[in-house]
Amino acid sequence: MIKNFYKKKNNLYIMLVILVVIFVVILGYIYMNRHVKFKDSNMAYEISRTIGPNVNPENVKYKDVYAIKELNIGFPGKYDTLEDIKLCKNLRILTINGGGDKWKPLKKEEDIDFLLYEQAQKYQKELSDIVPSLKRIEIFSFSNYLENCNISNFDFLAKCCNMKVIKIYDST
């Protein structure tokens, strides 16, 4: 009789563990299939474009954003905030303002956008919070083409334990 009691108790524990595991899996599935709410509409467009050609910001899901390995955001001045980069948890390569190796000579300097000093300081602060939080980042590339994006302090890169390559271009 006591054996039966312990056997039933063990079976109950096993069933409870199985139910908890199933519940956690279902919650994870629901979370990953939720639609992302971006803080910046231009960054939402850039991230959705990175995911695929037929993806628009309204139908981006967390599982799509987590799958991004490489992100090139271009000129940071077109964004109100860079916070949405944090959503790309598996990001390995981040390129900001192109890469110096990607620039083609421009005919006119008017073709280039420039950041104000205050904007550059704001983005530098945001990057110092965002980049170290990207645990898998291996390559960081930044370009200050014709001093259009004067971010000068990259000390935050020292906090990135998986960083293998840092490319900082300055054309001056």
Q: Can you annotate each of these PLM segments?
A:
Residues 9, 33, 130-133:
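Residue-level recognition of alpha-helix termini/interfacial anchor residues
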Residues 12, 43-44, 127:
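Short amphipathic alpha-helical segments that mediate assembly, nucleic-acid/protein binding
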Residues 4-20:
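N-terminal Sec-pathway targeting helices
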Residues 66-131, 136-172:
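Concave beta-strand-loop units of leucine-rich repeat
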